[in-house]
Each structure stands twice: as structure tokens, then as C-alpha cells.
From Swiss-Prot:
<feature type="compositionally biased region" description="Acidic residues">
    <location>
        <begin position="261"/>
        <end position="287"/>
    </location>
</feature>
<dbReference type="GO" id="GO:0006412">
    <property type="term" value="P:translation"/>
</dbReference>
<feature type="compositionally biased region" description="Basic and acidic residues">
    <location>
        <begin position="229"/>
        <end position="238"/>
    </location>
</feature>
<dbReference type="InterPro" id="IPR005706">
    <property type="entry name" value="Ribosomal_uS2_bac/mit/plastid"/>
</dbReference>
<feature type="region of interest" description="Disordered">
    <location>
        <begin position="229"/>
        <end position="306"/>
    </location>
</feature>
<keyword id="KW-0689">Ribosomal protein</keyword>
<protein>
    <recommendedName>
        <fullName>Small ribosomal subunit protein uS2</fullName>
    </recommendedName>
</protein>
<dbReference type="GO" id="GO:0022627">
    <property type="term" value="C:cytosolic small ribosomal subunit"/>
</dbReference>
<dbReference type="GO" id="GO:0003735">
    <property type="term" value="F:structural constituent of ribosome"/>
</dbReference>
<keyword id="KW-0687">Ribonucleoprotein</keyword>
<dbReference type="InterPro" id="IPR023591">
    <property type="entry name" value="Ribosomal_uS2_flav_dom_sf"/>
</dbReference>
<comment type="similarity">
    <text>Belongs to the universal ribosomal protein uS2 family.</text>
</comment>
<dbReference type="Pfam" id="PF00318">
    <property type="entry name" value="Ribosomal_S2"/>
</dbReference>
<dbReference type="InterPro" id="IPR018130">
    <property type="entry name" value="Ribosomal_uS2_CS"/>
</dbReference>
<dbReference type="InterPro" id="IPR001865">
    <property type="entry name" value="Ribosomal_uS2"/>
</dbReference>
Length: 306
């Protein structure tokens, strides 16, 4: 198990944690965490990252030691597998595919749907092979697959978490607003295009590169395990098929969303190392807007356009 005492600037550099977004995409509120600008890309101050990471890990240990849950959230393609694997490893709930509006603010209302999903899961798993055909079976299977996308990681979440850990708080704006409203502390891997003012424990770092996400998320999971005084809590549990399928679709492809800069090879090299940001699809944006309207959480700052 790795601790920040064995993590230094070199490890953060190797993981690409220092690469921010293109300077033109920055949020000025992140200025205090930026070391420099190079080839049009902001470079994050890793000395601050180390200090703030240790602060965040100490907080997470305290939450776990108190017996409270830490909800892991990261729905972008680069984060899905890591979020699921590390949350499972430390026995915590997670959202790796789609955050349902109102999960926190309307938890009592959503909880019965989670119980229904658990019941449906048992029915699907226990259905004999010879009965797995016909219109009724496929209708049930489609419903199961849809609910699995929403609830697979939170089936054991019986109460609101003591904290949430987020990869890319800009993408997960709805979750952050709900947590802020309920005064649930937010720990977040926060890139240079994010608003740090809505985050309780900012970890300045690259939230697009897989290695950066994996390193920070693994340390968060280690802190949970340390806080509970346990070994890995659930190593035998596999990553849900829906998450694996989503990752397989993307295998061998660079997530879309970044703007190319023809004629600036150095800038392109920085963008490649930093990890291309992934934009939400129009369908996902519409779903999130509908969810937000269905479960209002109060006024929040609008995220700047990527």
C-alpha cells in the first residue's frame, strides 16, 4: 500500500499530474495552483499538489475511521475503470457511468429504485438458461442493463456518505452542487479549468490522463483502507460488466473533445501527455439537464464552456 510519504514530485511528474488544460480554457480561480505556462498549456504547481493531497488523504482517513462511507465518482471514460476498481478494493460505493440527479438530495426517494434493481439483478442471474429467450425475457434484460448503468456501484449505500471523492468536478457539477447543499465535504482531483471554490479539499492535478487519475484515486482508496484498519475490503468483487464494456468500446482511441492547434507541435505534445479532455455528448447533457430540473438543488455557478 502506497502513502504520500513514498510519493514525491518524480512520481507525480511520471503520471502527468502537472499538466493542466490549455491556457485559454482555464478558470482564473485556479491561478494560485498554477506554476507556469508552457506552449499554451498551464503547468500545475506540484509542491502544492503534494501538500494538498496529504491534507485530503488525512481527511479521508478520518472519515473512514469514523465508519462513514466515501462515495467515489468519475464518469468520464478515462476514470471509469479506476473509480470502480479502487472503490471496490476499499469497499466503498461509487458512480462510474452516470450520476443520477437527486442521488444525494433525494436519497430516500431513489433508495427504493436501488432495492428494485437488486431484486431484478437476482431474478436475471437466477433465470435458467432455457428460459432466457422471448419478448418478456429481453424486456427484463434491457431494464436490468439500464438500471445497472445507474445503480451498480451504490447497491450497498444505505445512507448518505460522509464525503465524496470526485474526478473532474466540472463534469460532475450536479453532484458537487448537491453535496454542497447538504454540506457533504467534497474531495476532488481538480484541473485548471475547474472552480476550486466549490471544493472542500482541492487536489490540483490533471483530471484527463489515465495515469494521473489512477495514481490519485489509488491513494484515496489506500487512505480509506488505512482509516478502517483493514486490508483490501473486496478484492474478489469484479468490476461490473457495464463499466468493462464501456472501456472496451474506447480501447485504442483517444477520448474526443480537445482542440487541435495546427502548426504548434510542442503544444500538441503537451496536450497528448496531459490527456485529451472528454466532452459530454448532447444526449448526456440533455439527460443531466432533465435530471437537474427533476431534482432541483438550488443555485450554482455555471461552468465555463470547454
Amino acid at each position: 500500500m502506497e502513502s504520500t510519504q513514498s510519493i514525491g514530485i518524480r512520481e507525480l511528474l511520471e503520471a502527468g499530474v502537472h499538466f493542466g488544460h490549455q491556457a485559454k480554457r482555464w478558470n482564473p480561480k485556479m491561478k494560485r495552483y498554477i506554476f507556469a505556462e508552457r506552449a499554451g498549456v498551464h503547468i500545475i504547481d506540484l509542491d502544492q499538489t503534494l501538500d494538498l493531497l496529504e491534507r485530503a488523504l488525512n481527511f479521508i482517513r478520518g472519515v473512514a475511521e469514523a465508519g462513514q462511507d466515501v462515495l467515489f465518482v468519475g464518469t468520464k471514460k478515462q476514470a471509469q475503470i479506476t473509480i470502480a476498481e479502487q472503490a471496490i478494493r476499499c469497499g466503498q460505493p461509487y458512480v462510474a457511468e452516470r450520476y443520477i440527479g437527486g442521488l444525494l438530495t433525494n436519497f430516500r426517494t431513489i433508495r427504493p429504485r436501488i432495492e428494485y434493481f437488486k431484486q431484478l439483478s437476482r431474478e436475471v442471474e437466477e433465470t435458467p438458461e432455457e428460459e432466457r429467450s422471448g419478448k418478456e425475457w429481453f424486456a427484463r434484460l434491457r431494464e436490468y442493463q439500464k438500471l445497472r448503468r445507474n445503480f451498480a456501484g451504490i447497491t450497498e449505500m444505505e445512507r448518505l456518505p460522509g464525503a465524496v471523492y470526485v474526478v473532474d468536478p466540472k463534469r460532475e457539477e450536479l453532484l458537487v452542487r448537491e453535496a454542497n447543499r447538504l454540506r457533504i465535504p467534497v474531495v476532488a482531483l481538480t484541473d485548471t479549468n475547474c472552480d476550486p471554490d466549490v471544493i472542500d479539499y482541492v487536489i490540483p492535478g490533471n483530471d484527463d490522463a489515465i495515469r494521473s487519475i489512477s495514481l490519485i484515486t489509488r491513494l484515496i482508496a489506500d487512505a480509506v483502507i488505512e482509516g478502517r484498519g483493514e486490508e483490501s475490503a473486496a478484492e474478489e468483487r469484479p468490476v461490473p460488466p457495464a463499466v468493462e464494456e464501456a472501456q472496451m468500446v474506447e480501447e485504442g482511441r483517444v477520448p474526443a473533445g480537445g482542440e487541435e492547434q495546427p502548426g504548434e507541435p510542442e503544444a500538441e505534445a503537451f496536450e497528448e501527455a496531459a490527456g485529451e479532455p472528454e466532452d459530454s455528448t448532447e444526449e448526456e447533457a440533455a439527460e443531466e439537464q432533465a435530471a437537474s430540473q427533476a431534482a432541483p438543488v438550488g443555485e450554482g455557478d455555471e461552468s465555463e464552456e470547454r
